[in-house]
Amino acid sequence: MRQVTIPLIQSKSMFCVIYRSSKRDQTYLYVEKKDDFSQVPEALMKGFGQPQLAMMLPLDGRKKLVNAELEKVKQALSEQGYYLQLPPPPEDLLKQHLSSVGQNTSPADR
């Protein structure tokens, strides 16, 4: 069987590898190189659990990040070698409903 070598295309755009947490729902860790967690603090890795590869992504602005700001991700990767994306805060549907009907949600005011 003949071995084929595919040349790497050099690009000035930054790439990142995104991992999903095995312990925390909707928590993602962005690193610059696949399986390189050397810059991530040990305590964070312990709480994150076994990283599960989610995707590789160019950070050139062509694709939008869902719950993270592109510039913050790029800055964190450059400065600390990783970016941790936490889940959005849970929606308080009761509070939203009460404010939409004009009721004060503070227990002290009831």
Swiss-Prot record:
Domain YcgL: 14-98
Gene3D superfamilies assigned to the protein according to its UniProt record, in alphabetical order: YcgL domain
InterPro entries: YcgL-like_sf, YcgL_dom
Region annotated Disordered, chain positions: 88-110
Sequence ranges of Polar residues compositional bias: 97-110
Protein's recorded name: Protein YcgL
Source organism of the structure: Salmonella paratyphi A (strain AKU_12601)
